[in-house]
Each structure stands twice: as C-alpha cells, then as structure tokens.
C-alpha cells in the first residue's frame, strides 16, 4: 500500500497515528521503545496509574475478535488514566449496516480523543485516520493481513530487553507468514532497527512471493531457518483466512515446521522463543517449548501493556 506521504506523521515528523511500522524511522521506533521502558515499572506499583491521559476518551473498536490485544489496550489506557469505552460491535449500528465512517463520525461527536481499531479489511485504520479531526488519533490494532504495529513494537521491545542490540542478531519468523500481519510489522521494524539477518521460514504455499524484496532470507525448511538463530518467532496457522488447499493438513505442517525441544537445539543455546498468540500447542509449537526456559511468550504479553501505553501517550501528545 503506497501513499504520497506518511499519514502517521504531522508536518514536523511527529507521530500522530500508529498505523504501521512501515515508514517509521529508527528514531521514532526507538522513542516508542524507550518510552515503554519507562512505563514497565507502573505495573508493579501499588497504584498502577499515571495521569498522562486524564480527561481523554479512548474508544476501542474491535470489528474482529481479540482477547490479548483488546484487554492490554484497555489496561494500558486505564493506567494512563483515560476514560475507556469498549464498543460492542455485534450490537452496534455497524451490525445494522451503518458505514465505518458514519460510525466514526457519530463516535467523534461524543468527544472521542483516540480510536483503537481492529478490522478485517486492510487499510481500514488508514481510512479512519484520514477522516478524523486534527486532535483525534488512531491506533491500528490489526487490519486484515496488512499490519499489527503494536504487536510488532512489543516484539521489538522483547527482543531488545533480552538481546540488547539488534545489529548482530539473526531472527527467524516461522509459520503462516502469508496471512500474518504480525510478520509484516516485525519485518519492517527489524530491518529499520538494523537487525543483521531476518529469515522467513515456512512452506512455499505460506510464504508471500514478495518476501525477498523486503530484505529477508526465505527458508523452506525449519532446519535451515532456525539454525544458529538468536530469536525465533512462531506463528500459528490462520485457518480462518485460508482459501484453497494450501496445506495437506495441520499434522503435516506440524511434522515439518512445528518447533520441538529437539529442533530448538539447532538455534543458539541462548535463543529466545516468541509467539504473538493465540498458541496452538502441538501444531506450530510443542508445549515443552512454550513452557520451557527459552520461552519469553508471557513476558511479551506483560511488555505489551507498557508498549501500548507508550504509543497512546506519544500520539496523544502530538497535534496534526
């Protein structure tokens, strides 16, 4: 998706919406990660709040189901002292045929300050960002196959937390890359942050043809893909988005690309294992790996709150 200018930034180059990790500079990505680092300690305080968004209204608009993302956004906004409104899409006027922009216009009339949007159509958050008032901000919580920038950012935070520096890292992204908005967000962020090597690993039917053009190495066997890797990011099979016979079966996929403790030994001894969730144990990853010492899957969730606090506080502090 190409744009004449980056709609995420104002004329001063400041972040006013978070729509994608693509097109964001290393300086902006680092600003978000550094700000998140300052928020991590909030979760361990007796009073888990800071007043940065006091008096602001944050509307969570999830047109697709979500547990972790919606909950962590709600927690993040609450810890910033915002008023949080969760729209019940199934019972809203949108379910009765109201257009997306009419829904946004009506909610804007209720003095919304920030929209967190998850939508099945790629580009929906961009459309909203182009039609809101200058003081209103949009954060993409996942749009179609296109992008999931806050997941990408929390993945970057997790990697930086455990590995410190990106410049010598080999990161392998394994699984259903074709349907994964997380993979795209991770790739854009990793390359911008100077990761030494990014590998995309999966069967040919689940790896987009344009991956090599994104500056990554494509591997069609798990063994090649994770050998010597510092970071392994596992992705589930998104059966709900698949059309046609892309795989013989999930069992065959698991046999070839499922991460087991034995296969994990091909990676570096201090490699970390990540997963954006939801996890399908026994398919893309064995329980022994999920619950093992190299797994940082639960810390990812914890860091996600701080990262989303950082994103909302930064965009809300800048004017279009």
Swiss-Prot record:
GO biological process, one term: 'de novo' pyrimidine nucleobase biosynthetic process
Catalytic activity: carbamoyl phosphate + L-aspartate = N-carbamoyl-L-aspartate + phosphate + H(+)
GO cellular component, one term: cytosol
The keyword Transferase belongs to this UniProt entry's keyword annotation: yes
Positions bound to L-aspartate: 96, 181, 236
Pathway: Pyrimidine metabolism; UMP biosynthesis via de novo pathway; (S)-dihydroorotate from bicarbonate: step 2/3
Binding site for carbamoyl phosphate: 68-69, 118, 148, 151, 277-278
EC top class, as a word: transferase
EC number: 2.1.3.2
Keywords linked to the UniProt accession: Pyrimidine biosynthesis, Transferase
Keyword flag Transferase: yes
GO terms, molecular function: amino acid binding; aspartate carbamoyltransferase activity
Subunit (UniProt): Heterododecamer (2C3:3R2) of six catalytic PyrB chains organized as two trimers (C3), and six regulatory PyrI chains organized as three dimers (R2).
Family stated for the protein in its record: Belongs to the aspartate/ornithine carbamoyltransferase superfamily. ATCase family.
Role description: Catalyzes the condensation of carbamoyl phosphate and aspartate to form carbamoyl aspartate and inorganic phosphate, the committed step in the de novo pyrimidine nucleotide biosynthesis pathway.
HAMAP family reported for this sequence: Asp_carb_tr
Protein name in UniProt: Aspartate carbamoyltransferase catalytic subunit
Phylogenetic lineage: Bacteria, Pseudomonadati, Pseudomonadota, Betaproteobacteria, Burkholderiales
Gene that this polypeptide is encoded by: pyrB
């Amino acid at each position: 998706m190409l744009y004449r200018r980056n709609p995420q930034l104002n004329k001063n180059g400041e972040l006013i919406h978070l729509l994608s990790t693509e097109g964001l500079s290393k300086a902006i990505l680092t600003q978000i990660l550094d700000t998140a680092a300052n928020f991590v300690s909030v979760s361990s305080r007796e009073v888990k709040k800071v007043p940065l968004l006091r008096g602001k209204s944050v509307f969570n608009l999830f047109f697709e189901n979500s547990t972790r993302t919606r909950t962590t956004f709600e927690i993040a906004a609450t810890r910033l002292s915002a008023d949080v409104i969760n729209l019940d899409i199934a019972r809203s006027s949108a379910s009765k045929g109201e257009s997306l922009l009419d829904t946004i216009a009506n909610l804007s009339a209720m003095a919304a300050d920030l929209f967190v949007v998850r939508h099945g159509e790629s580009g929906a958050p961009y459309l909203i960002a182009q039609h809101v008032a200058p003081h209103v901000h949009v954060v993409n919580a996942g749009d179609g196959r296109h992008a999931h920038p806050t997941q990408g950012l929390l993945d970057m935070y997790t990697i930086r937390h455990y590995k410190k520096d990106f410049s010598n890292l080999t990161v392998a992204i394994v699984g259903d890359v074709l349907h994964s908005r997380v993979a795209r967000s991770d790739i854009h962020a990793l390359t911008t942050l100077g990761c030494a090597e990014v590998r995309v690993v999966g069967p040919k039917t689940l790896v987009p043809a344009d991956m090599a053009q994104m500056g990554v190495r494509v591997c069609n066997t798990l063994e090649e893909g994770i050998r010597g890797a510092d970071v392994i990011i596992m992705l589930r099979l998104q059966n709900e988005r698949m059309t046609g016979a892309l795989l013989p079966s999930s069992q065959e996929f698991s046999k070839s690309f499922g991460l087991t403790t034995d296969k994990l030994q091909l990676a570096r001894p201090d490699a970390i294992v990540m997963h954006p969730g939801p996890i399908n144990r026994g398919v893309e990853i064995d329980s022994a790996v999920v619950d093992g010492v190299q797994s940082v899957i639960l810390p990812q969730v914890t860091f996600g709150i701080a990262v989303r606090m950082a994103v909302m506080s930064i965009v809300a502090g800048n004017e279009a």
